[in-house]
Amino acid sequence: RVDYSSGNWSEGLTTYLADYWQVELASEDEAKEMRYGWLRNYASITDGDEKSLQAFTTRHHTASSTIGYGKSAMFFHMLRKSIGNEPFINCLKDFWLTYRYQSASFHDIRDTCQTHTNINLTVFFDSWIPTVGAPKLSANLTQTNAPERLMTINHDGKWVYPLDVEISSDANAIESTKLMRGDEITFALSVDDVKSTKIKLDPNFNIWRKLDAAELVGTLRDFIAAKQATYIQLTSDIQDGSAIISTYFMENTTYGEQTPDSNKSKKDPVIILGDIASITEHLNKSVNAIDSEHLMPISEVDFVMVSTYITNTPTLLISTPKVITDKDFSMLISRARHYGKYSWLKISPNGITEKGKWPIQEKVFSF
């Protein structure tokens, strides 16, 4: 049973063991995509909606689910990477045998795992359980006495975790794991007569962190939890698309506007409803214009929803059939809510559903 005084650990542990680990055993690529999905969900919630693991008790909305399930599952993933597979499994076995008829907390998990490792887990748990926020990774390379350079990695906080680092140059490639602790770490890097150096931090999404802008892939869930979204209706038979979208798809109300507001913050999302011609025109201006071939062709009778970025603005494009009633639109919008993890969705008149995700991009620090 869960001792809720220090947070609900069971949802995250169940997600990690019952859902994630089975995926990892079958395919590391799919496991990586699942870890990325947790981080992508985190990127879609606002700072004001974020709570600590200690404050999470049960799921109420998208933000609480992101923390209580996603962040908690990633916490156990980082714990496993910190102490190793065998100690992690033995820890869970001991924890089950000790507390199966009792209430237990994150602290009890910590104390049980501490008997299986020499790593100070108090510091690790304290950096993740009562805190909000996440590491924002950056790297810097400075020249010292040749052939050495100094590599500095900053994460904008004091979290503790093992960080995978990939360093490649003209001559060679190095993969290592560094223990992040404190504000930053600095270490010497020997690079022999190279013209350029490329660095990847956590390239496989093994830690709970803020994704770099280059790594962000648009998802429909971005708009389910969005706040202060601007609504723009171009052409459609729908009388009041803003009200329907707010009621059946989003957790918050949109701001209805007929034309874009140039003074509005580019961080605030935009929802555009129109016919196939107008939506295709906007899609061709987006960062996913090349990738959009996966959802083509779009006919005038299809319902299409696409999450993308246009001039750095999160944008949801919705194309409705040429003839549609408010009732049918409400049903389609409500159905789309179940596809939050995807980047785009297409529903044909006969009900056939196609869906997909934009390819994940890597963040590379080049020097």
Task: Explain the meaning of each model-derived region.
Residues 1-152, 199:
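Hydrophobic alpha-helical and helix-loop surface patches within well-folded domains
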Residues 14, 61, 98-103, 208, ...:
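Flexible loop/turn segments at secondary-structure boundaries
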Residues 21, 156-158, 170-172, 204-206, ...:
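Short, glycine-/Ser/Thr-/acidic-enriched flexible segments
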Residues 63-64, 124-127, 137-140, 151-155, ...:
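Generic recognition of flexible, low-complexity loop/linker segments
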Residues 81, 100, 114, 130-133, ...:
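Hydrophobic alpha-helix feature that most strongly marks membrane-spanning transmembrane helices
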Residues 121-122, 136-202:
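Beta-strand-rich binding/interaction modules
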Residues 177-178, 205-222:
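Edge beta-strands of extracellular beta-sandwich domains
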Residues 215-367:
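Solvent-exposed alpha-helical segments and adjacent loops
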